[in-house]
Amino acid sequence: MRGPLPSTREIYKNALNVAWPSAAESVLVSLVGSVDTMMVGGLGPVAIAAVGLTNQPKFVLLALIMSLNVGVTTVVARRKGQQNQEGAQKCLRVALMISFGLALILSTLGYLFAEPIMQFSGAQPDVMEDSVAYFRIIMMGFVPMCIGLTINAAQRGVGNTRISMTTNMTSNIINLIFNYLLIHGKMGFPRLEVRGAALATILGSTVACLLSIRSVLKADTYLKLSIKDHWGMDRE
């Protein structure tokens, strides 16, 4: 026998609870690039243009991962509604393998073809060197960024929306601190300029990824991962 249908207000409330963390995550992810652009402003217009030109191709690549993550959130939420914890964990394992493989391919292609990608984005000769260097360093940290986003998407599916905010806020704070230290060479750190901004970004995303991984290694969490789990693909 089926239970009573939820009211319209409850439907909108549930939809909002699922949607706003995803929207907030997108804003925080884009904020990293904006912060980099602002903080290299002291280096001159060439540095600003070099960093700004990389944002569009980076988000084109991220859009593929985020499209996968929409499905991850939906399937994990469905498995939890069915009281199928193992099914939810299996979905996360499969999603992580796909996310890792896809991110590895995309980051490798992005690194190898950074120069033509920047040319297509409109980079002029005077900004080409800095934009290619920045984009290649960002691609080196693309895999942990995508792994973290996929885990966060699965956590949203089981109602744990706090992890997305925590990891992305941490990423932005670390990026901000190391931008200050590495762009202009403060407090004994080397002056790396545009490359320093890129290194700060991947450092922040790597720490965020580690926090996301830690969230699924806890014994008291709904989504738990272990090396001993079955990580193979199946038809189910």
Could you describe each region identified by the protein language model?
Residues T37, I48-Y111, M145-S164:
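Small-residue-rich hydrophobic transmembrane alpha-helices
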Residues F142-C146, T170:
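Short hydrophobic/small-residue motifs within alpha-helical transmembrane segments
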Residues M1-S22, V76-V143, F189-E236:
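Short alpha-helical transmembrane segments in multi-pass integral membrane proteins
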Residues S22, S26, T37-M38, T74, ...:
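Transmembrane alpha-helix boundary and packing residues in multipass membrane permease domains
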Residues Y12-L31, V35, P57-L64, M140, ...:
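Residue-level signal for short hydrophobic patches within transmembrane helices
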Residues S99, A154-L181, R195-A198:
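Alpha-helical transmembrane segments of multi-pass membrane transporters/permeases
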Residues L31-A49, M118-P125, L181-L192:
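Helix-terminus/linker motif at the lipid-water interface of multi-pass membrane proteins
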Residues V60-A63, N175-N179, C209-I213:
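Hydrophobic transmembrane alpha-helices of multi-pass small-molecule transporters
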